[in-house]
């Protein structure tokens, strides 16, 4: 199923909820997590990522941390291809400004071109999550069939 799961790590108030989802899936599927932060590397940032992983009881052998400095959509797409990820988890703000609507958001750009399955979660400040509604698009490929069977 999803053996290699990527997560777009941000240090926003919403980042914890994405980590909780990733930790849940990692444990349920015995997957390897690939944690990607867009920005310059620093030990302080790496320690923050490790602290989040530890908070959700993710074993150090179950994840790999990457830092990339590039436009977020491009960096994440390259990351997906380089690591051959089966799933990428990222957050999305529910409300966008008009400017962002026309220029495009990271989530929107990846929905159009990501070479893998995406799990896009609305931003929530609390770490609790529950899936009430799922929206699934398909191109009727074997990859899509695998994702739908997972549900």
Residues of each region from the PLM?
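Residues at secondary-structure transition points
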Residues: 13, 67-74, 101, 105, ...
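Flexible loop residues that form catalytic
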Residues: 10, 38-41, 93, 139
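Acidic, proline/glycine-rich short linear motifs
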Residues: 20-59
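Structural beta-alpha unit
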Residues: 41, 54-88, 96-97
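Hydrophobic alpha-helical membrane-association signature
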Residues: 18, 45-48, 106, 147
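Short acidic/Ser/Thr-enriched loop-to-helix initiation segments
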Residues: 1-34, 125-151
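General small-molecule cofactor/ligand-binding pocket signal
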Residues: 34-36, 64-68, 119
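Gly/Ser-rich helix-loop-strand patches that form or flank binding pockets
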Residues: 76-127
């Amino acid at each position: 199923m999803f053996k290699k799961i990527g997560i777009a790590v941000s240090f926003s108030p919403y980042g914890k909820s994405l980590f909780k989802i990733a930790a849940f899936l990692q444990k349920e599927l015995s997957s390897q997590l690939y944690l990607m932060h867009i920005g310059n590397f620093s030990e302080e940032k790496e320690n923050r990522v490790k602290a989040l992983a530890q908070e959700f009881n993710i074993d150090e052998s179950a994840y790999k941390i990457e830092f990339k400095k590039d436009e977020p959509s491009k960096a994440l797409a390259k990351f997906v291809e380089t690591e051959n990820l089966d799933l990428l988890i990222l957050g999305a703000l529910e409300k966008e400004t008009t400017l962002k609507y026309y220029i495009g958001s990271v989530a929107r750009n990846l929905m159009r071109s990501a070479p893998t399955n995406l799990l896009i979660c609305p931003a929530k400040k609390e770490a609790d999550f529950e899936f009430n509604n799922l929206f699934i698009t398909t191109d009727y490929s074997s990859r899509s069939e695998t994702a739908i069977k997972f549900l």
